[in-house]
């Protein structure tokens, strides 16, 4: 029996005036590429991500703890950039280059842990508050009001002062500061979505609350959380750097940009005759913080422009 051969498919010419259907992914990429600042932000974030991933290659780690900056003496005077120390050294001769490279990994780890903790907390409390309402909503909102009444940095300082100086305790403190904002945002999105027709249809068909929340509500409320998280990454790193500079975040000698500034805080103003003598002790870690925050802010603005339905109609 002979096999039936199929004729090769011949592509049909596109009719005049008919546009190709654009998928969601292509639409997202197109909107992203239309904004040069979005591309710049993505490039900056990717560059820092590569530095963090390649930290063991770019700066050979110390044997006992890769996050502890090696130092080549105990001289109190910082040394300018030169052979062996391309970015210079801080007080007690901690290598700025090593601290900047491994500090990129610290920045990502701290920011991601804080965001993950805040998002998980918001998914639990915001879902209960926004979906069920009533006493649960009232209780959660009053708790968030209490936390939001305190200035964020001061609250973080108090928490770390009580728990003790460490990276873990600083992460806990910043997460405590951040979770109310995420919770209120998600609760507002739940209030908006829970009365839409497809949610009411799922309830009418006998769907359980957990099924409706996880399958119908959360997927349609998560984008504002992603936008907030991307915009918040830089702020988290600034807060952690501030805690380290105050001696409440990373321990002395830890690879963190705020800790690098703290190690040379006595020399930031330079000498009496030349205030820029030790410029590198502030400019090098300060530039790393500035670029990291700038990259995430530009990327967060891009996500907002792409995913915010109120902005899509005007573009």
Region locations from a protein language model:
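N-terminal signal-anchor/first transmembrane alpha helix
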Residues: 2-4, 13-65, 140-143, 221-222
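Intrinsically disordered, low-complexity segments enriched in proline/serine/threonine
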Residues: 10-13, 58, 63, 68, ...
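Short, intrinsically disordered, low-complexity terminal/loop segments
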Residues: 1-4, 313-315
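Alpha-helical transmembrane segments of integral membrane proteins
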Residues: 91-315
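Short, membrane-interfacial amphipathic segments enriched in basic
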Residues: 10-28, 82-95, 132, 210-215, ...
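Residue-level signal for helical boundary/lining positions with a hydrophobic bias
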Residues: 31, 58, 86-89, 162, ...
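Hydrophobic alpha-helical transmembrane segments of membrane transport/permease proteins
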Residues: 2-5, 51-89, 244-255
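Intrinsically disordered, low-complexity segments enriched in polar/charged residues with Gly/Pro
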Residues: 16-18, 64-66, 71-76, 185, ...
